[in-house]
């Protein structure tokens, strides 16, 4: 097969999220595009929230590769149909979290699914096709073989993660001038990866399935070069470190932080980490000096029963102590919370938000419990999922039947919690504390979450029309109404997901 032109497409998400107003090049797809370009192919990359897909260029491709989040699967399928209508024989490849978890379901729309990391797998697939060889010995793929689905063994996780992404491969990336950013109400954020994997196994988290629990570190020299490259390219100082847990290997993190300090890198960064970071004073001091000023931490809840169910290995007392310690070093805490587990009630959710305010958590991100049918069964039983379409699986919408409240109630609690945390009263509180920059950032967050709240309330209105038969007068789930297969875990037009689940009782809004 003649393969020279390879095009990558990442469709936009259909609903607002906490990063809707951020302009950034999502990490995975542009990196894989860079690796494929370096392997000798003519590469084009379209990230739709940066710029529109240029379909004339897509149709001239030899292979089209999609990176799709679950919420963008419906759009991805539309785009694939558009390509197939014009180029019926165009080879199409899908990758990303959704494809990794739902490989066989995703395969119905494409020729090959790249599972988990694509750094080595995609170049190998392209090389095999160039040589007209089959994919029988390619690890990490699910593909069609004469009408049969082949699911090859997983590929060992990639250890060479030092490649610096060429951001100029992304069509339109350099077209965002400061006036355009201001006009479109967008703010540049650069993404940086210093490691992959997470050694923890929280029951609700998909990261171990996608990137593995084997923790791999990028070389310090490569990280520093990447920071400098991105700063020089676009002139911004705002970075988000996308590692699942930036401080897992404390010795490595400290070497990197000291190097950032020594290099006098002028930036402002956010990183993901865990509460354990609070036990290391030197780490906290280095984070502050290295200008990684906000720690994004999965607090999840201030209710001990919820924390135990989620396997977080932390309790309310340890969270409060850790938050106080982190903030004493002048660092901000962005706490994320998972709402709606079987140990959650309306009262426990409200107490969690009240405690977050009392503990002076600086920012928060709220997520109704989510996941994939079967994979997240320990946290959400299979018979309690309902997803009429994948577009609601973006972390903001309720996609299951909670045990202790109706779905609409949980959806409205998300909206109300955002409203309370980012209220004018709380912004004024920051001003009284003379935390002027913090007040300004809270105001910015309030504007962003307003869009989420609007979509959340609309979803709640719909849920109210279809949930009643499953709950008693105290909003307790009547599990006998569900049966073994329960409500439909997903019904997407033409989808095989949930095939055989005839009792599709919940539709879409």
Language-model-derived ranges and their functions:
Residues 4-5, 32-160, 368-374:
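Glycine-rich beta-alpha loop elements in corrinoid/cobalamin-binding modules
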Residues 168-334, 341, 354:
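Radical SAM [4Fe-4S] cluster-binding motif and immediate context
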Residues 15-29:
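Glycine- and acidic-residue-enriched helix-capping/strand-helix junction motifs
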Residues 5, 63, 112, 236-238, ...:
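Residues at the N-termini of beta-strands
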Residues 103-108, 343-358:
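Catalytic cores of alpha/beta
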């Amino acid at each position: 097969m003649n393969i020279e032109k390879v095009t990558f497409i990442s469709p936009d998400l259909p609903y607002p999220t906490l990063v809707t107003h951020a302009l950034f090049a999502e990490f995975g797809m542009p990196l894989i595009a860079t690796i494929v370009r370096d392997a000798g192919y003519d590469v084009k990359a379209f990230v739709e929230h940066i710029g529109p897909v240029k379909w004339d260029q897509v149709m001239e491709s030899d292979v089209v590769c999609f990176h799709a989040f679950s919420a963008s699967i419906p759009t991805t399928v539309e785009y694939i149909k558009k390509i197939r209508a014009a180029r019926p024989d165009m080879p199409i490849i899908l990758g990303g979290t959704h494809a990794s978890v739902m490989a066989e379901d995703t395969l119905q729309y494409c020729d090959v699914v790249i599972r988990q990391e694509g750094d080595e797998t995609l170049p190998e697939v392209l090389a095999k096709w160039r040589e007209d060889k089959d994919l029988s010995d390619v690890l990490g793929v699910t593909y069609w073989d004469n009408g049969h689905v082949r699911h090859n063994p997983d590929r060992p996780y990639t250890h060479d993660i030092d490649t610096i992404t060429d951001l100029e491969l992304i069509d339109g990336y350099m077209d965002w001038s400061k006036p355009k950013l201001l006009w479109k109400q967008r703010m540049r954020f650069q993404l940086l990866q210093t490691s992959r994997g997470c050694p923890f196994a929280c029951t609700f988290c998909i990261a171990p399935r996608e990137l593995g629990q084997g923790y791999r570190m990028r070389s310090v020299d490569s990280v520093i070069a990447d920071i400098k490259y991105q700063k020089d390219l676009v002139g911004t100082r705002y970075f988000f470190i996308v590692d699942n847990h930036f401080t897992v290997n404390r010795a490595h993190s400290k070497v990197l932080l000291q190097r950032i300090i020594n290099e006098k890198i002028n930036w402002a960064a956010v990183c993901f980490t865990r509460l354990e970071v609070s036990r290391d004073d030197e780490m906290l001091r280095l984070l502050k000096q290295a200008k990684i000023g906000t720690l994004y931490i999965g607090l999840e809840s201030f209710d001990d029963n919820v924390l135990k169910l989620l396997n977080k290995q932390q309790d309310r007392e340890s969270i409060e102590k850790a938050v106080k310690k982190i903030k004493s070093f002048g660092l901000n805490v962005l706490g994320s919370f998972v709402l709606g587990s079987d140990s959650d009630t309306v009262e426990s959710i409200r107490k969690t938000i009240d405690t977050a305010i009392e503990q002076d958590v600086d920012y928060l991100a709220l997520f109704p419990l989510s996941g994939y049918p079967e994979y997240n069964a320990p946290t959400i039983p299979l018979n309690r999922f309902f997803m009429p379409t994948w577009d609601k699986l973006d972390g903001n919408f309720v996609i299951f039947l909670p045990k202790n409240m109706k779905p609409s109630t949980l959806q409205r609690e998300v909206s109300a919690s955002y409203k309370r945390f980012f209220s004018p009263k709380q912004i004024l509180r920051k001003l009284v504390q003379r935390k002027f920059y913090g007040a300004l950032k809270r105001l910015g967050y309030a504007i962003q979450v307003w869009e989420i709240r609007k979509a959340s309330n609309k979803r709640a209105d719909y849920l109210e029309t279809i949930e009643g038969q499953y709950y008693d007068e105290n909003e307790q789930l009547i599990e006998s109404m569900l049966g073994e297969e329960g409500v439909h875990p997903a019904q997407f037009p033409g989808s095989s997901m949930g095939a055989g689940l005839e009792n599709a009782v919940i539709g879409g809004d």
